[in-house]
Regions:
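N-terminal beta-loop-helix "entrance" segment that forms/cooperates
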Residues: 26-39
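Short, glycine/acidic-enriched capping/hinge loops at junctions between secondary-structure elements
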Residues: 2-6, 32-35, 69
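Short catalytic/ligand-binding loop motif for oxyanion handling, primarily in non-cytosolic enzymes
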Residues: 30, 64-67, 100-103, 151-153, ...
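Cysteine-nucleophile active-site neighborhood
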Residues: 58-127
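Amide-donor transfer/coupling interface in amidating biosynthetic enzymes
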Residues: 1-27, 43, 48, 52, ...
Length: 220
């Protein structure tokens, strides 16, 4: 529900009138969201597969060290991602969704990081003239919370993909297709002020040792 609320808050900043629908997997039932909430507000893919949408957000999941094919609902996610190519004008792949999308559509493998990239980082814009960055400076700040990465060279090797922004550590932050119908975003512009602190507490309770305190003073 937290991610749902954060994304709705971001979408509400647009002057456009947006009608939002929520989608859940049928092959896996979430253990972190109240079942009654899902039943009341969420659809399954079979319920919406004949509709067409202007946009879709495929969100993240705490699956950093799990290979894509070992994700319990991977087959269903693949079916949905394939469907987006004909039924959604623009698809926004966020965090784990970005790595899932890059792997499914372009065969780009996600890599495990020895230490979680966790905190607020500076980003270099590679495509300054893009409408995506209208009003931005050459660098911008955004949170990251992930132990997964891709080789930037693997993304750059795909003719249909453009690297739009990278982190101060040289990691992919934003990429898109040349027709702007697919976006792949590894940072979290939707996060609230306390989200990183809450995620740190969650990771500590899990006994994770590869997580340091979140970075709050970017190096650039």
């Amino acid at each position: 529900i937290v991610t749902e609320t954060q994304l709705l808050r971001m979408l509400s900043n647009t002057p456009l009138q947006i009608q939002v629908e929520f989608l859940q997997t049928a092959s896996y039932k979430s253990t972190h969201t109240d079942a009654n909430h899902l039943k009341q507000f969420y659809h399954t893919f079979d319920q919406i597969k004949d509709r067409r949408y202007d946009g879709m957000i495929i969100t993240g999941a705490p699956l950093d060290y799990v290979p894509c094919e070992e994700t319990l609902y991977w087959d269903e996610v693949c079916k949905i991602m394939e469907w987006t190519k004909t039924h959604v004008h623009c698809t926004f792949h966020l965090c784990w969704g970005a790595y899932a999308g890059l792997y499914y559509h372009y065969g780009i493998e996600k890599l495990d990081m020895p230490k979680k990239l966790f905190g607020i980082y500076s980003h270099e814009i590679r495509k300054e003239t893009s409408p995506l960055f209208r009003g931005f400076n050459d660098h911008f700040l955004a949170p990251h919370s992930r132990a997964t990465d891709v080789r930037l060279s693997d993304v750059e090797a795909i003719p249909n993909l453009e690297v739009m922004a990278v982190t101060e550590t040289g990691s992919l932050a934003i990429a898109k297709t040349r027709d702007s119908r697919q976006f792949f975003v590894t940072c979290h512009a939707e996060y609230d002020r306390e989200t990183l602190a809450l995620e740190y507490e969650r990771d500590m309770k899990k006994g994770l040792t590869s997580v340091d305190l979140p970075v709050t003073e970017p190096s650039s």
